[in-house]
Amino acid sequence: EQIDRLVLLRNQLDQYIAQLRLRQAKASQNDIKTATLPAFTGFCREFKNANLAQKTDCLRKTYIEAVKNYKIDNKMRTQCFADDENSGLYIIPVEKQSRGENIKVFHQTQCICIYYRGAYEDFPKIHRRLLDYAKEKGMTPHGYFRNIYMEGPPTHGEDKQSYITQIALPIKFISPAEKK
């Protein structure tokens, strides 16, 4: 239990450090890194064939519903399929012991990721870059992306170039040589 808590804290610190570095970096500096996405419990809603405006509105509604019924534990995120970016899950992390029809447990997984600064409309370009990198390095993706919203409209308003998102491509196996 204590080790799991320390691992979670380490992963959160890694995200915060990356966020601070990205604030200081130029918008074009989007290095691909290996990382471990920690296990968590989430309140989830599916979406299908949704455009960006629909996804934004529904994610906001999902967040409000989660806040009304559960104690929130971390940053909002979406999970979309590699072959269909307009379908997937809205995920609001909640306390580990949460229970309910829309609660799902997500296991820890290795990934390659980019801490991206910019507009949400450009996610498909970042997704393609991660897929190309995985293919080039002989990595096997799980088949979905996880977009973790670190800073967005509540922090930066309409300044889309200042939004910060960790865009992750979970990988089935990353060789020790690829870990940085």
Kindly give the residue locations of the regions a language model identified:
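A solvent-exposed interaction/effector surface
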Residues: 4-180
